């Protein structure tokens, strides 16, 4: 289950990478690094594995922790290949090489030492390496800098990120918002 946990953690961390890259205008996503030395702890109120369907569902107070990084949500679903890719004995869940996509729902929250990302939903396609975060507001913050939109799409392989506004219904401006905090020069 260790490789499986690393992939789940990578999903949460990739959300933060997207925010940092957009705020810093870097051409590539360079911050996606997992610490192989720190243990990964996954907790939820319930874990249901439907091996025949290729689904593992974590529900209720889902927490994924590695070092200072935390991913929280109400539900996390893992979809994995069931085509007999693994000839070994049945396990308590999919191995990392078989995972196709991850979906996180219900108040998605990811935090590192300096960054926070929130959304209503998020998904990560392992084959295409595309991360999508959506919600009434997708908020990315890093050291006082804040980005707000309603849909963030990140091509992890190329570093291309797109943040869409929220449409113009129910008082929303339909525009992406960014707040940048200049660093103090007096010290």
Where do the protein language model's features map onto the residues?
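Mature-chain termini and adjacent capping regions
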Residues: 1-187
